[in-house]
């Protein structure tokens, strides 16, 4: 059996996000505002499905954080619950006490994203009993966060009502940022096999990834193949995987059932290894060893994992797998892994992105065919190349993202942008995505001049803002946002 490593700690994409909550107040403002805002906030978090950590009502005056003593209590609670807390939400029902808030965060030292919200004043309630002045207080709080070097996320509007749809959207955005930051800082990526010798483009630095909290767990491809060969054809896990494959897409009648069986066994072993090592994503040596030494492609196994929120990248592109994971955490949508592959006639802002492919079915957006690799099939023999997931990606919104370890500079760099998939035809085999991106030539120039790989991760929604906030502000990677 494969060895077990430490506990896998990536939050599931669909799991609850937990916020540490700080409600601020300042003594000469009406304390009722703080009490009411706390009640409104907790009701909203409950309704939206978020968990939270907050001081008990009787722990401080007015159920809020104001004094240094309050801050010490709140920070101690946050430290006790630090493994649960994905981010901190700071709410200002009134001007708030900047020292109480910044002292809480400084003492807790959670190193998680922080959201700062300030409540709106009403024109008919700016007397002594009703005025909030949070519009001003937010500036003071943010000034202190800046002084202490604590990065934070702002709401879309400078002030907003806690019960508003705008604040609900702010919380959703912030929760996604928290998922990306927590997920990547604790990510465990499987590297199955060695990179293709001909592709130096996918070389990377494990040490730079580890510096951001990303652990790479390698395994020799021979171990995977050896265990796949030892599996009994009638094993329950194999039969279940065969059923899953048959329901996943259309398999042409010409395909030998034994080749489907090989694919099922390979998938079972890879799944088991991923589970045993508590891995969040993988990158696989998908040619030519697995075809020559085992007799099938790896694409379908990768597609099936991706469909279950375990992204898998081609050609042992480990950093590509991290890029896919980032998109998954930001969007909740299954990502694909593609080559920037072809121009599209004379359309300057359109290109064809392709792979053999390992596209998950949800990423494809329509039914898929499962057949042989085309180019490799010609040289390696089609009988050794079953397992390619084929089709044309359906039209719709798209976000693309790619990170890379820049060993010459000792940094992690990335690029990011949004575009759309189109239904324009492209008569090529494999997985095809025709993409429209504004100022595409400018983007390609940036990739060329800055040494980025030919691989890119994409997902079927717009989520660039979330990734930009998480990566540039909290992870500290060098980021180019296109467009």
Language model segments and positions:
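N-terminal beta-loop-helix "entrance" segment that forms/cooperates
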Residues: 52-77, 226-235
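Periplasmic-binding protein-like
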Residues: 84-94, 115-117, 279-285
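Cap/lid and interdomain-hinge subdomains that line or gate substrate/regulatory clefts
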Residues: 14-20, 52-53, 122-240, 246-255
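C-terminal catalytic subdomain
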Residues: 306-423
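Short, acidic/small-residue loops that bind anionic groups at enzyme active sites
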Residues: 102-131, 139-144, 303-316
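Long, internal scaffold/assembly segments composed of regular secondary structure
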Residues: 240-330
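Extended hydrophobic packing segments that form well-structured cores
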Residues: 39, 380-483
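Glycine-rich, highly charged phosphate/nucleotide-binding loops
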Residues: 63-83, 97, 262-269
């Amino acid at each position: 059996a494969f060895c077990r490593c430490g506990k896998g700690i990536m939050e599931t994409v669909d799991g609850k996000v937990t916020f540490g909550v700080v409600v601020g107040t300042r003594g000469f403002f009406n304390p009722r505002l703080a009490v009411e805002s706390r009640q409104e906030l907790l009701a909203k978090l409950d309704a939206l499905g978020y968990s939270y950590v907050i001081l008990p009502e009787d722990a401080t005056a007015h159920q809020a954080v104001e004094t240094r003593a309050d801050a010490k209590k709140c920070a101690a609670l946050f430290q006790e619950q630090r493994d649960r807390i994905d981010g901190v939400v700071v709410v200002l029902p009134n001007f708030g006490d900047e020292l109480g808030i910044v002292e809480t965060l400084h003492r807790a030292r959670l190193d998680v994203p922080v959201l700062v919200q300030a409540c709106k004043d009403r024109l008919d309630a700016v007397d002594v009993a009703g005025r909030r002045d949070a519009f001003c207080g937010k500036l003071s709080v943010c000034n202190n966060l800046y002084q202490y070097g604590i990065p934070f996320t702002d709401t879309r509007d400078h002030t907003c009502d806690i019960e508003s749809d705008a604040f609900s959207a702010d919380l959703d955005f912030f929760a996604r940022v928290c998922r990306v930051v927590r997920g990547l800082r604790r990510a465990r990526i499987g590297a199955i096999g060695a990179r293709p010798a001909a592709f130096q483009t996918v070389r990377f630095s494990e040490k730079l990834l580890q510096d951001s909290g990303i652990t790479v767990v390698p395994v020799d491809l021979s171990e995977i193949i050896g265990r796949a060969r030892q599996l009994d054809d009638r094993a329950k896990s194999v039969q279940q995987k065969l059923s899953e494959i048959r329901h996943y897409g259309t398999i042409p009648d010409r395909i030998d059932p034994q080749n489907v069986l090989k694919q099922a066994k390979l998938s079972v072993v890879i799944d088991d290894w991923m589970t045993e090592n508590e891995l969040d994503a993988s990158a696989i040596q998908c040619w030519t060893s697995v075809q020559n030494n085992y007799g099938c492609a790896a694409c379908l196994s990768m597609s099936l994992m991706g469909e279950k929120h375990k992204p898998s990248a081609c050609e042992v592109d480990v950093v590509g797998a991290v890029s896919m994971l980032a998109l998954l955490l930001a969007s909740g949508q299954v990502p694909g892994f593609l080559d920037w592959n072809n121009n599209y006639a004379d359309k300057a802002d359109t290109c064809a992105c392709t792979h053999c492919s390992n596209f998950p079915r949800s990423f494809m957006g329509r039914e898929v065919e499962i057949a042989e690799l085309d180019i490799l099939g010609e040289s390696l023999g089609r009988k050794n190349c079953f397992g390619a997931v084929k089709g044309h990606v359906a039209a719709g919104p798209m976000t693309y993202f790619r990170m890379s370890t820049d060993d010459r500079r000792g940094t992690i760099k990335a690029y990011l942008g949004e575009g759309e998939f189109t239904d324009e035809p492209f008569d090529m085999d494999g997985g095809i995505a025709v993409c429209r991106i504004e100022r595409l030539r400018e983007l390609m120039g940036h990739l060329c001049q800055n040494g980025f790989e030919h691989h890119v991760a994409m997902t079927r929604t717009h989520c660039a803002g979330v990734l930009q906030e998480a990566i540039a502000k909290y992870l500290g990677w060098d980021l180019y946002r296109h467009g």
